[in-house]
């Protein structure tokens, strides 16, 4: 089955079609998904009737508003039901694998709490703003000590980024980068190049992609930057922690974790 890591909406040219595809896959039992912060943003705008937001958010709202009235009402109702029913994170393969949009700490795994939900969907920031006007993110992955392999996204990187037993597979597809999936339990990364740049961000990823790896910092170390260098999908990072040894789960069907 496919497992979607969130941020299915915003900035892309066919948000409604993409959302319908994922909702159908999940309802038919062919996929699982966790919510991203962009799903929450769009849902909030639809509920409040807001006409203000980022350029990417309003692009999505316009696509939804362009639907015929009956189709628009049906889509909004289905989207609301879908997003609100999603778990903030997934624990799979008897605890060997975890999936969360922005990551997860060991103490939140398998537990339902407001703090854990907020972390899984939005991550954690230092409270500081970088020179691009974006929040400086806490590098939670560097301190992760859990047994489960955590697959996440949220912060675009130039290439899949392994840090200990975590891997970030958000490789900036919407910014002209790649759409990346991790085949599990094979531990094989598969990437497909974006057809074009769909959205222009404020800064660029390594290798000339539209968005650079977001500035991150450990608590008390503001400004620490962790950036992945461009490399072949599945290659061992050229700097930073080595790729971890693949977990050896009980035999099961293949799971693909993907994100746009």
Regions found by a protein language model. Name each.
Residues 79-111:
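Hydrophobic, aromatic-enriched interface-forming segments
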Residues 44-48, 109-113, 204:
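Short aromatic-enriched loop/helix-cap "lid" or pocket-rim segments at secondary-structure transitions
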Residues 1-14:
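An N-terminal domain-cap segment
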């Amino acid at each position: 089955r496919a497992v979607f890591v969130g941020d299915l909406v915003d900035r892309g040219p066919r948000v409604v079609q993409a959302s319908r595809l994922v909702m159908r896959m999940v309802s038919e039992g062919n996929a699982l998904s966790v919510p991203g912060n962009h799903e929450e943003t769009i849902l909030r705008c639809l509920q409040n009737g807001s006409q203000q937001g980022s350029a990417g958010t309003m692009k999505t709202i316009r696509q939804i508003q362009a639907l015929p009235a009956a189709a628009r009402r049906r889509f909004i109702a289905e989207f609301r039901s879908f997003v609100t029913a999603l778990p903030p994170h997934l624990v799979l393969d008897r605890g060997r694998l975890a999936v969360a949009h922005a990551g997860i700490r060991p103490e939140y795994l398998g537990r339902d709490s407001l703090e854990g939900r907020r972390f899984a969907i939005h991550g954690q920031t230092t409270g500081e703003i970088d020179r691009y006007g974006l929040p400086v993110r806490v590098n939670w992955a560097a301190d992760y000590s859990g047994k489960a392999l955590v697959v996440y996204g949220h912060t675009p990187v130039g290439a899949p980024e392994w840090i200990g037993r975590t891997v970030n597979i958000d490789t900036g597809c919407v910014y002209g980068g790649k759409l990346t999936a991790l085949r599990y339990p094979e531990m094989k990364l598969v990437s497909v190049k974006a057809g074009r740049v769909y959205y222009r961000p404020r800064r660029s990823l390594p290798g000339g992609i539209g968005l650079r790896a977001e500035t991150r910092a450990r608590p008390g170390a503001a400004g620490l930057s962790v950036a992945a260098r461009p490399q072949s999908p599945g290659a061992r990072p050229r700097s930073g922690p080595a790729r971890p040894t693949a977990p050896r789960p009980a035999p099961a069907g293949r799971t693909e974790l993907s994100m746009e």
